């Protein structure tokens, strides 16, 4: 696993709040601000749950359109919200607003959210993983998300998200990379891909490549790049098939 980064929740929340104030309407931001204050002061789950679901009635799904300066201000390596929508950003901020001093209660509360989430709500949750307090406590939830049959939810974990590289064990990491190839999404947006490469993953990819070649199907060039450091002879052999 990569070195874990100490995330300052207040710093991240302040940044998200600043973006939403500039990018959304005044009425939307007023509603969100009121909900954030109510959630952080009361610590009531029902307020968080209702606000998390209601965001889409107050913000539209337009991309947040960050400037280069705003992107460079992001203090979390591997986290890139450039393609996020206002709805997703608002939901992330709500998750960060719930009191987190009691780690068990915080995790249990967010587990309830993802347990009842629709696709868009699940995407926002998984995108927020690298920003959450007590991130080590969401490893099983992240591994579960990787097994989803919804590509959009899987991409929320796999792409532009530093959480997998920092917290998933090799088994879950390898499954994520292999699944990315299987569902046909690129590997390049996976943070920490080279650093987390390992011999077990290389062998899994060789087996996968052999199956595809036997069925006269193409093999992604990104696959060979991961196998080459461990099995260069096999790469040369299979590329000639």
Region roles according to the model:
Residues 1-98, 177-241:
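N-terminal alpha-helical scaffold/docking segments in eukaryotic complex subunits
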Residues 90-209:
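Eukaryote-skewed repeat-based solenoidal scaffolds used as protein-protein interaction platforms
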């Amino acid at each position: 696993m990569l070195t874990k980064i100490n995330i300052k929740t207040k710093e991240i929340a302040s940044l998200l709040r600043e973006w939403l104030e500039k990018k959304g309407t005044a009425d939307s931001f007023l509603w969100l601000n009121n909900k954030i204050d109510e959630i952080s002061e009361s610590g009531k789950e029902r307020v968080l749950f209702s606000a998390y679901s209601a965001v889409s009635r107050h913000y539209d799904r337009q991309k947040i359109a960050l400037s280069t300066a705003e992107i460079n201000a992001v203090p979390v390596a591997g986290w890139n919200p450039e393609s996020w929508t206002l709805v997703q950003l608002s939901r992330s901020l709500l998750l960060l607003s719930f009191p987190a001093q009691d780690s068990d209660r915080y995790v249990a509360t967010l587990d309830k959210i993802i347990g009842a989430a629709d696709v868009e709500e699940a995407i926002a949750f998984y995108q927020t993983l690298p920003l959450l307090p007590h991130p080590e406590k969401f490893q099983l939830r992240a591994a579960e998300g990787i097994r989803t049959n919804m590509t959009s939810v899987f991409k929320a974990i796999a792409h532009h998200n530093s959480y997998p590289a920092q917290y998933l064990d090799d088994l879950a990491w390898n499954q994520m990379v292999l699944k990315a190839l299987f569902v046909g999404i690129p590997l390049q947006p996976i943070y920490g891909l080279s650093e987390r490469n390992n011999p077990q993953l290389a062998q899994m990819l060789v087996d996968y490549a052999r199956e595809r070649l036997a069925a006269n199907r193409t093999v992604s060039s990104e696959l060979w790049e991961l196998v080459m450091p461990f099995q260069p002879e096999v790469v040369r052999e299979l590329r000639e098939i």
